[in-house]
């Protein structure tokens, strides 16, 4: 797998609330990745005190992908029950499977190691202030684009010097 082609972070255009209940999660990969699964759920499903609890998450395949010139853009919409979400990805190529976490990639053997801390991606809170809500009046507005090239004057003598 080409690890340099895989990119995600839990902010900005990669993970954001679509509305008050839905969360968009995007992942960029190379064309060698054939299937992607996301494991997601509430960060506190396994408890809040640490210890030996194991967070598992719900497994779901990401089916929607956009073909860009050099990458694939995988997109899914999640509905976190408590408006917070913890997740990681399972990436499949023709011959191998890797798990993608905040701190890098793990093989199937590495993910099952006793005592390993899994640094999952986390959307701590879907804040209503982060939801884009366009006012209704925008649909009735006429928008103009001013082409600045029309307003460029001839070069003056000072511009040439």
Language-model segments: which ranges?
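Non-catalytic, glycine-rich low-complexity segments
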Residues: 1-33, 111-129, 133-134
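Aromatic-rich carbohydrate-binding modules that target alpha-glucans
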Residues: 31-83, 92-113
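Single conserved hydrophobic/aromatic residue that forms the stacking wall/gate
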Residues: 151-154, 158-161
């Amino acid at each position: 797998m080409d690890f340099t082609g895989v990119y995600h972070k839990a902010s900005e255009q990669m993970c954001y609330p679509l509305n008050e209940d839905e969360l968009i999660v995007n992942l960029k990969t190379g064309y060698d990745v054939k299937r992607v699964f996301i494991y997601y759920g509430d960060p506190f499903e396994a408890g809040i005190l640490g210890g030996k609890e194991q967070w598992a998450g719900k497994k779901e395949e990401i089916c929607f992908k956009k073909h860009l010139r050099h990458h694939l853009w995988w997109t899914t919409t999640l509905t976190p029950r408590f408006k917070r979400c913890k997740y990681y990805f399972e990436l499949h190529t023709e011959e191998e499977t890797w798990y993608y976490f905040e701190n890098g990639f793990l093989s199937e053997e590495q993910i099952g190691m006793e005592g390993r801390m899994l640094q999952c991606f986390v959307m701590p809170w879907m804040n209503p202030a982060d939801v884009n809500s366009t006012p209704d009046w925008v649909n009735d507005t006429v928008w103009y684009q001013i082409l600045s090239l029309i307003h460029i004057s001839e070069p003056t003598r000072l511009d040439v010097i």
